[in-house]
């Protein structure tokens, strides 16, 4: 659902929910959001809570009625490690995707190297039958639970669990959070050279702190930086929020 909206240049509406907060999660389903971001950065990471949170995004009434056949709103997870820390925390990416998340939000995306490492860690090291996709897949093999959550066979999951728009038919989404002066400076190079970053989210709080204006998110300098991020994303055809 979310990727379909993005690839057709349609707005998508979502919200953050606390990992394990079933009231927040069920309300997000009932309110009709297009996606939800399960918060696992600042609120602590608990994979048992994440497993339960994902299950409560399955609206079985709508599934039985034939309206949908997967989790809706689309479940994304904001993980704890910053982009530069991902290489030493591969298990976080692996276990989050293995539970069936449809996408990841990655804090402090700042360099080309970190972005490419992220793309590689989210990609299986298998031959892609849909064309030449420039990614050295490093995702560990364990698709059984994710395939079950998606409601498909393992073969179908592996075929679909590729990164959009790197693979135009992919159903996984990486959203990089641009929230530092360094990230802003390197954003054009990241978006032009690493095609697996599907969208960008602005992090105004950390961005303000990085600019020496902690807590002053409405400062003109911070607002100008936010606008620059949006313009860069527009220039490179990458969805942003």
Predicted segments with their positions:
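Expand to "…catalyze enediolate/carbanion chemistry for C-C bond making/breaking, isomerization
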Residues: 1-241
